[in-house]
Amino acid sequence: MTLLITQYYKSENDEVELSQEEMDICSYISQNNEDNYDQLISEDPRWNVFLQLTRLRKSLLNWYDFKPGSTLLEIGGGFGALTGLFCDHCAEVVSVEGSLQRAKHIQERHKNRTNLKIYAGNIGDIPIDQKFDYIALIGLLEFEGKGSKDRLIYSDFLKSIGERLKPGGKLIIAVENRFGLKYLCGAPDPYYGIPFAQINQSSYKKGTGHSFSKQELTTIIENAGYKHFKFYYPLPDYRLPQLIYSEKCIPKTSLKERLTPYYIDSSSLLAYENDLYDDVIENNALEFVANSFLVECSFNDMDFCDVIYAAVSTDRGRREGFATTIHSDGNVKKTPLYSEGLPQLRNIKENHDELESSQLKVIRTLLKENRLVMPYVAYDTLSDYLKIIIRKNPEEFVLLFDQLYNSILQSSSITEHMNPSFHGYNDSLDYGVILEKAYIDMIPVNCFYHDKELIFFDQEFVKEQYPAKYVLFRALKYTYFFIQDAERYISLGDMQERYGLNHLWEEFEKEEYNFVSLNRKYNEYHNFLKRTYIDRNGMRVNAKQLLRANRKND
């Protein structure tokens, strides 16, 4: 049973009453017997309800290799969004939360944990004699100075909490970047509520918090006495990460295919960050404009987590949620986020073996300790190559799709029977070759192109008795979606006609929507997904309004 200690709590800590939204979150936690709120967040559209209760918060560190048997101090537990994750990975967790009501609901949310102790109160008032392997300071440092720009305040705080670390212990910090790309694009500042408020060093009254540039945060960490640190760049931000890069692994190619930004309020946007990442990467500027920073800090030890990149699919649930990590030793590992994902992990291994037996090139994988392990390969993906070649040589672009389609046809034996569960199945249509097993991830983003050969990887999903043309449809659909000017060089209509997809495209769109909506849990996350949509016309209007305002001032 989780223990809650309140003797160090001072009533003035709760001078700010909980909002109605926070009171509702407390009620939701009290009524829920398990830490699973998918149904609830599908029904309640409020942002803070989603943020405090979604499992997606765990993506910040569910890929991180905590040392076995370790102890962790969480400072600022909030409503316990990350507390359960820490309990899963560490032998003992102590969570400190300044609000008594929040502390009570951390206890309620994780009441069945046997390795969790919760303190209500300010960390400076609590005489915890224990020292820890890890201290987690997630989204709290910005508030320590109550909006002050004085770096000494933040350095002193980091130095004081560092006294609770064991020798060789690690402080883990997650903060906003003042120069984050979404804020450069016009998103409201998180602590002022006004676009560009901290970027232009405005004279607005102090905000509720203060965010940092990378150099500013580096100086604060160094002045606190931490001699060693490692920066990670969670994208789109630290609250709901999908990709986590590091200083030792900066993207070299487009992020559009794997990253979906979101906005709490998109009404003030002047640009869309996903449109800018290609230029950011080409100009080596990601470390300056990443929306958030995640930092490991140590006073005297450089033995940091050996993960240099992580891609997480926490949104896909317990059976299909994975962390794919690149390690400093040159290995790539694919790890199920929950034990329920082990069967799917074995399926992926089987898929690779079957494709290899069909004389196709695949990245060789081994199943070790409930992980898939494979070598890191520095080749370009076919997707990246297609983006280049369509502009230089459209004929080669077409030939590459011929090559891909031939590989799809080669991947499995053929059957005469179409799967009747195919969404929108119409027996009057000619679907072409039906594969006994259709490996639907045989698309350019999951394929390397090297020495004129296709080398497939991460072949996760298989559909039995599906059309080969459906796999090709997926390859074309996403290629044209992510190469926005592809139509200038060769039209999608021409490609559809070449492969006999004209009469099938609409039916395949129905099947694809059905697959993606189930895979990405649209029903559960539809309120969040609304925040990923942007109004491009609205951005143009915003830009024109700025121009008109400038002319009036002249």
Mark where each language-model region is.
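Conserved SAM-binding loop of SAM-dependent methyltransferases across substrates and taxa
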Residues: F79-C90
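A short glycine-rich, Lys/Arg-flanked "PGG" loop and its adjoining helix->strand segment in the class I
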Residues: L152-K170
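Conserved structural core of kinase catalytic domains
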Residues: I363-P420
